From Swiss-Prot:
The name this protein goes by in its record: Protein LSM12
Extent of Polar residues compositional bias: 176-194
Gene: lsm12
GO cellular component, one term: cytoplasm
Family note: Belongs to the LSM12 family.
Residue ranges of domain Sm in the record: 1-71
Region (Disordered): 173-194
Amino acid sequence: MAGPGEYFAIGAYVSCRTCQETRLQGEVVAFDYPSKMLALKCPSSSGKPNHADILLLNLDYVSDVEVINERTQTPPPLASLNITKLASRARLEKEEKLSQAYAISAGVSLDGQQLFQTIHKTIKDCKWQEKNIVVMEEAVISPPYQVENCKGKEGRALCHVCKIVEKHFIDMENQKGVQRNPAQQSQKETSTSS
């Protein structure tokens, strides 16, 4: 392990033994001294060319660490970040969280919140209007959020939204059935063994 004040240079080749007695060897891609975490780029375990495994190692749990080859060149520059794309992603995440918070504060049922999330995965243009879900400004789903509660302009958009709502509740019922079956099975086993 690196001693006090010692660091692993990015690009250096390192070898070490894990607590499971596995010998690892790879290129250092990151090292955090305070947490003693080392990230190694190793040949792909799948054997695919042009692929690599990135392993995160806690140096408290490895032994026989040795630097095989120090990096002699300066490391390549860091990849540039697309700030516009990152800002857009952050804005969308914030809007989603605010939408969830609004639904909770408005007293929307859990079924309504789950349906909104299901619709939002497929159609981003959906929002809350009090306790109603408004989709593409063409369909409105009011509590208790069933297919018969879908209203709007007749057409493909409303039909599509109704299909999403119907499938959502079928999937929810199937999930509940799967969760109930193990409990029912154990009850049957208990009653037959009595």
